[in-house]
C-alpha cells in the first residue's frame, strides 16, 4: 500500500495485521517534528487498532536516537519488548534471521559508512491510547 501514514487505519480492519515492519524511517530529529516519528505515541495508537493481539512491531534503523526513543516509548507504555539489539551485525545470535536476510539500499549505504544497524521487536496493547515519553535526549535537539 502506498499512502500517507495518517490514512493507514482506513485500509485495515481490527486484528487484520500480524506484523508491522518499520525500516529506516526518518528519525525526525528536529524538536518540532518529534510527533512525526513512526514509533511515537500517535502512530502506535493507530497501529493498535488493526494489529492482532499477538502482533508485533519491528523497527530497523541506523538512528541510535530513534532506537533509544522507541525503547523509552516501550518502557513508559509498559509494552512487551521481545528483542532489542544495538548492532545486529555484531551480535547476530539474538537477532531473527529474517532481520539480516535482506538489506535495503539505505542499510547497505549505512553499513558502508560504518554505522551500526539497530533492531527492536515489541508487542502493542490493543485499542490503547499511548503516552509519549519524557525523553531527555530530545531536549538536546
Q: Each predicted region: which residue ranges?
A:
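S-adenosyl-L-methionine
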Residues: 1-22
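Conserved Class I S-adenosyl-L-methionine
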Residues: 42-48, 68-91
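A short glycine-rich, Lys/Arg-flanked "PGG" loop and its adjoining helix->strand segment in the class I
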Residues: 37-56
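Conserved class I S-adenosyl-L-methionine
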Residues: 29-34, 56-77
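SAM/dcSAM-binding transferase cores
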Residues: 78-141
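Compact, Lys/Arg-rich rRNA/RNP-binding cores from ribosome-related proteins
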Residues: 20, 39-40, 63
